[in-house]
């Protein structure tokens, strides 16, 4: 044999071969036919079982035999693919109406594998026989099988709209399909209405076909998504589990899940919910149990005594497959091509198929009836001249001679002559003669009826309607899925997501932040905090994990950080730098931190800058949902910076202290509530290159402590301060020296809880008791506590 060598480019070969492969996958494997709702392997399985008599009214038969028949005659692929498809057709959590009944382990909603095919037994379900009914009446086209040894149907007669009733899912080259199951009675009713009113709208159709009806039940939300899918073939709905509350002893309760979304793995769902509980992602769940048994699906979620069951349920809806989004993608093979189809198109294609099936069946029945009529007429004629016929047959040489003589002598046809010579003697009684007359009358009526169906389109549609109504009456079942018009908004209370726990928040001057358990803090003490060289603790306080931290920076920005998102770090260890949580500029520094519980309107923040600007903003303005970037809390001009932020519950006095020892005290009610992007107003009238070193709230039980660059500390009583108006010059708190004048580098208001001070110089930290610092007069410079010649100038101070 001579070889044929073609010189082709690799690009052309690959493109051509992949195109052929894709066409095969699309048409012959992954996508269902719109007419019978079946993929080729499913159709071959059902036809093989029907052909071998493995039907509903017979006994179960080993699945392996069916798989062997399918592989041997119709589907030359691996046995596992055939058996898997066969098993799916028997799973009542996958199909709304199973097409195969199976004895033995056919898998589970937990995605457990089925038993091997040598152990399971199967037969067609009663409904699946309606897919195959009349297939032997030339209703559908047959094609040769893969080795031309037998024929297989291109499509099944499908006496009900299986594509909509059982749905389909599949992925092929460039195409995917997701068609949900529907209620049989609703689909048939919708089809009947379409037959009566071909121009029916989607809105009108949805009065009958309300939406998907999943075998696993559940609650479907989003009428608009259903409508869009029915109009265009694509749409989206939310499917959520059916969850009820059940009381337990001692006032506790549990959530009981009895229905889950379609195609959700139950065991994976239980595992996920338990992981959320174990990882403390949700607070209030004691235990998760799978209590499913032969009576039905049941997942028990036991709750703590005072748990917010509604919020826990909503959290699970959002963070587990207790609720999913189902995306319609109604692609099916129509006229040999994949097509995205709406509801009307699917029903129209099915109806056209039924018109063809009923027409072909009627032609077949008419042909058979006419053939029988011809035979009956011949028998009746023969019986009317019985003696002559008998004599002719007796005088004939053989059967063929008798037939030829009958045709020649009495004008019988070949078929009639065959029937006459095959007639048994007992059929010559009067009873059988009358039976032939009756059969003749019945055949006349049948032929008339069949011809009317073929000639009258309305009569043909009436047949389709009658047969659909018959199936509806026989197989009608109640809807399992509930449809709700709107998609529910999921609201989750913070306490459900975050276990309530008191922790210690700490922030250093260099921007290291952490939360620490009270146990670790108490075991170490404040002074044992982990710090980098040169860093100092700016603030520490007790907060709750459900609180929110607001970290303010010198650039007039704040960071919004939920406490539970802070790393849980031991007190002796270094914290996490703020820039690792929210990115900030390299030269940006933290100035203060506060925790918020509820961002209530009554509270407000006072923000003050180095160059004497101040503003007031209500706490509610700081609430946000953005955690990933700094947010503006004050517009700060160039060469200025934010030096402090004070949180107050109500209006009270604040005092401003400057570098040159000026002090101004006034009420915050002089400040209007402004937006976060405002620049503020003048706080104090600064002169001679002076700047603000402190702005804090103050009341009559407080004192003010300050330290100068020369190492002197001074403490004054509240009474020294003089309440004035905003933007004034203020009073002088230092005695001005001509040589080496004192300049304030740090100041603080001493509250009742303050007992100690720490003063930081360039090379030294000075600790002392606040009570040991005596109260001074207005025009003094205080007492020296640090020798700056030995330890360098003072830089800062904190109170504890």
From Swiss-Prot:
Q: Which reaction does it catalyse?
A: ATP-dependent breakage, passage and rejoining of double-stranded DNA
A GO MF term: DNA binding
| One Gene Ontology CC term in the entry | chromosome
Question: Which CDD domains does this one have?
Answer: TOP4c
How the protein sits in the membrane? Peripheral membrane protein
Tell me the superkingdom of the source: Bacteria
Q: Which GO terms describe its biological process?
A: chromosome segregation; DNA topological change
- What PANTHER family does this protein map onto? DNA GYRASE/TOPOISOMERASE SUBUNIT A (PTHR43493), DNA TOPOISOMERASE 4 SUBUNIT A (PTHR43493:SF9)
Name of this protein: DNA topoisomerase 4 subunit A
* UniProt lineage: Bacteria, Bacillati, Bacillota, Bacilli, Bacillales
């Amino acid at each position: 044999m001579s070889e044929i060598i073609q010189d082709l480019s690799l690009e052309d070969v690959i493109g051509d071969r992949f195109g052929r492969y894709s066409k095969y996958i699309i048409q012959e494997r992954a996508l269902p036919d719109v007419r019978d709702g079946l993929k080729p392997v499913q159709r071959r399985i059902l036809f093989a079982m029907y052909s071998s008599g493995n039907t509903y009214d017979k006994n179960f038969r080993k699945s392996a035999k069916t798989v062997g028949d399918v592989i041997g005659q119709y589907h030359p692929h691996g046995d596992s693919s055939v058996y898997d498809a066969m098993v799916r057709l028997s799973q009542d959590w996958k199909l709304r109406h199973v097409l195969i009944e199976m004895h033995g382990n056919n898998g589970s909603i937990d995605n457990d594998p089925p038993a091997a095919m040598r152990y399971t037994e199967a037969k067609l379900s009663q409904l699946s026989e309606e897919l195959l009914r009349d297939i032997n009446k030339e209703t559908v086209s047959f094609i040769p099988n893969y080795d031309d040894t037998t024929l297989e149907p291109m499509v099944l007669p499908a006496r009900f709209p299986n594509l909509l009733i059982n749905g389909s899912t599949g992925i092929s080259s460039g195409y995917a399909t997701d068609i949900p199951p529907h209620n049989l009675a609703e689909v048939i009713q919708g089809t009947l209405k379409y037959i009566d009113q071909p121009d029916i709208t989607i809105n009108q159709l949805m009065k009958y076909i309300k939406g998907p009806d999943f075998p696993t039940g559940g609650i479907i939300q989003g009428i608009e998504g259903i409508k869009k899918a029915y109009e265009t073939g694509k749409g989206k709905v939310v499917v959520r589990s059916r969850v009820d509350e059940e009381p337990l002893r001692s006032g506790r309760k549990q959530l009981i899940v009895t229905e889950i979304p379609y195609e959700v793995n139950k065991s994976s769902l239980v595992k996920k919910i338990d992981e959320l509980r174990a990882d403390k992602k949700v607070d209030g769940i004691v235990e998760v149990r799978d209590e499913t048994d032969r009576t039905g699906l049941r997942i028990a979620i036991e709750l703590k005594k005072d748990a917010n069951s509604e919020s826990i349920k909503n959290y699970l809806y959002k963070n587990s497959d207790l609720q999913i989004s189902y995306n319609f993608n109604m692609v099916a093979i129509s006229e040999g091509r994949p097509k995205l189809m709406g509801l009307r198109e699917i029903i129209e294609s099915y109806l056209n198929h039924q018109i063809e099936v009923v027409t072909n069946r009627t032609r077949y029945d008419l042909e058979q009836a006419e053939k029988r009529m011809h035979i009956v007429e011949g028998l009746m004629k023969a019986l009317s001249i019985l003696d002559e016929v008998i004599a002719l047959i007796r005088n004939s040489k053989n059967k063929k001679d008798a037939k030829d003589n009958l045709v020649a002598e009495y004008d019988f046809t070949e078929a009639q002559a065959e029937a006459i010579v095959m007639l048994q003697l007992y059929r010559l009684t009067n009873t059988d003669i009358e039976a032939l007359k009756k059969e003749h009358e019945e055949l006349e009526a049948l032929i008339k009826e069949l011809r009317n169906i073929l000639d009258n389109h309305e009569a043909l549609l009436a047949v389709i309607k009658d047969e659909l109504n018959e199936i509806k009456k026989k197989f009608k079942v109640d809807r399992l899925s509930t449809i709700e018009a709107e998609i529910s908004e999921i609201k989750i209370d913070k306490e459900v997501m975050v276990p309530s726990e008191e922790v210690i928040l700490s922030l250093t001057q260099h921007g290291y932040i952490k939360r620490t358990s009270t146990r670790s803090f108490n075991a170490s003490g404040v002074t044992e905090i982990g710090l980098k060289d040169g860093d100092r603790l700016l603030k520490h306080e007790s907060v709750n994990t459900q609180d929110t931290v607001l970290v303010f920076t010198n650039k007039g920005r704040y960071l919004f950080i939920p406490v539970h998102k802070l790393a849980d770090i031991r007190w002796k260890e270094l914290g996490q730098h703020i820039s690792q949580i929210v990115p900030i500029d390299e030269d940006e520094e933290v100035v203060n931190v506060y925790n918020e519980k509820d961002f209530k309107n009554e509270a407000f923040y006072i923000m003050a800058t180095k160059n004497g600007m101040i503003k007031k903003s209500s706490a509610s303005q700081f609430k946000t949902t953005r955690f990933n970037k700094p947010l503006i809390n004050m517009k700060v001009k160039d060469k200025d910076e934010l030096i402090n932020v004070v949180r107050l519950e109500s209006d009270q006095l604040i005092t401003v202290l400057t570098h040159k020892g000026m002090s101004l005290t006034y009420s915050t009610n002089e400040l209007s509530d402004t937006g976060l992007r405002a620049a503020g107003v003048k706080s104090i009238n600064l002169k001679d290159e002076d700047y603000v070193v402190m702005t804090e709230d103050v009341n009559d039980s407080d004192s003010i402590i300050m330290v100068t660059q020369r190492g002197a500390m001074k403490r004054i009583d509240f009474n020294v301060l003089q309440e004035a108006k905003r933007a004034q010059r203020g009073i002088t708190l230092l005695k001005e020296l001509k040589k080496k004048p004192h300049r304030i580098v740090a100041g603080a208001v001493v509250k009742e809880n303050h007992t100690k001070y720490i003063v930081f110089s360039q090379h030294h930290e000075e600790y002392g008791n606040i009570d040991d610092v005596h109260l001074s007069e207005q025009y003094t410079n205080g007492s020296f506590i640090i020798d700056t010649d030995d330890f360098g100038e003072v830089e800062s101070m904190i109170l504890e």
